[in-house]
Design a protein with these regions (language model features):
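Glycine-rich active-site loop/strand segments that organize a redox cofactor
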Residues: 12-43
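Rossmann-like flavin
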Residues: 31-133
């Protein structure tokens, strides 16, 4: 933001507001231990909640849309996503529903996707509108 708030990345990112981090929780747990990994994951959930709350509290026209689907486009992705689903439920108390191909197709009419984990708490917004408030 070398010029003004919203000019750079904060106004141009993809607008995804999703839980977690850029790598999987087991990797984080291996680096910082299970207790801090759990706290960090909880912070990410709180971050998503705060964004949603601020949009509502301040009446920001950010075009919020509920939900985020982590999709599988290859058979191996199904196994990876289901392992992640199990890890989140077992170690973090966060249950994500699995959408098979038909359930996903009802939401996203594309034959490309094999299935998805759906997170109803995450979402998408218009990043510049959110930044400008």
């Amino acid at each position: 933001e070398a010029r003004r708030v919203g000019w750079g990345a904060s106004g141009r990112n993809g607008g995804q507001v999703i839980l977690g981090f850029g790598c999987e929780q087991p990797k984080i747990a291996a680096m910082v231990g299970p207790e801090l990994s759990r706290r960090m994951f909880d912070w990410s959930i709180e971050g998503v909640r705060l964004v949603r709350e601020r949009i509502a509290t301040h009446g920001i026209d950010a075009g919020w849309r509920d939900g985020h689907a982590h999709v599988a486009i290859k058979p191996r992705h199904i196994d990876e996503l289901k392992a992640w689903q199990d890890d989140l439920a077992t170690h973090y108390g966060y249950a994500l529903p699995w959408w098979d191909r038909e359930q996903l197709r009802a939401q996203l009419d594309s034959p490309r996707y094999l299935g998805a984990l759906f997170d109803p708490a995450s979402g998408h917004l218009h990043p510049l509108n959110y930044t400008l408030g």
